[in-house]
Amino acid sequence: NQPWIRRFFSWLMEQGEALGWGRRPSETANEYVGKLAEKYDDLEVDLMTIGQVYTQVRYSGRELGGEVEEKAQKSSERVQRRLEQ
């Protein structure tokens, strides 16, 4: 079962590709969101939160829960609203 954060990060990469920013194979999730944060500086904190949580889920294999999940979901909602404008 794929956690929502993985689906969201895939969506985020699609948005980046639409802007002409493909993700290099050697690029980490945090480097990628950092690149997006340079363009959308108003989303820097939210993007960094998403990158950190995505990395945690991807490499630990555990589901999110509690406060961390709530914070990441709120960040993802703000990012999605902004990028869909």
Model regions: which residues?
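Membrane-proximal, non-transmembrane interaction modules
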Residues: 1-85
